[in-house]
């Protein structure tokens, strides 16, 4: 009977133990970029992407409420395991919306080299 009781207590205690979760490379890289964002502010997105070394799987751009013809932010989504992570970029200069929105809709927001290349020369104002 004692063995049964000890075994039951042991099983319940295992459920309460929190395992240390190791962060994967994608999470580490994204956190690194956010922590060192000063390195990328005022520079083309190409600098950030070169350091990141991970291709985005989805790109979603946003417009300010008062002007839907331009883009002022873009979210670059990355996938690792079953989780999605993203980096948001606020652009120094507004980007013309027409061409980018057409690409995003045609590809259902999946990242393409064509779209990434458009953003590479755009200057980063902030990273979050």
Question: What is the meaning of each model-derived region?
Answer:
Residues 1-24:
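Bacterial Sec-dependent N-terminal signal peptides
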Residues 21-128:
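Residues within mature, well-folded domains
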């Amino acid at each position: 009977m004692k063995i049964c009781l000890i075994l039951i207590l042991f099983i319940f205690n295992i459920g309460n133990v929190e395992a240390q979760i190791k962060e994967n490379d994608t999470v580490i890289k994204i956190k690194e970029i956010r922590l060192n964002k000063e390195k990328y502010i005022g520079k083309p997105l190409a600098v950030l992407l070169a350091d990141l070394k991970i291709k985005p799987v989805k790109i979603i751009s946003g417009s300010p409420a008062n002007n839907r013809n331009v883009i002022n932010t873009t979210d670059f989504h990355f996938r690792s395991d079953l989780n999605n992570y993203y980096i948001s970029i606020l652009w120094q200069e507004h980007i013309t919306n027409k061409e980018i929105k057409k690409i995003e809709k045609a590809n259902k927001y999946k990242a393409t080299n064509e779209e990434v290349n458009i953003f590479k020369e755009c200057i980063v104002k902030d990273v979050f």
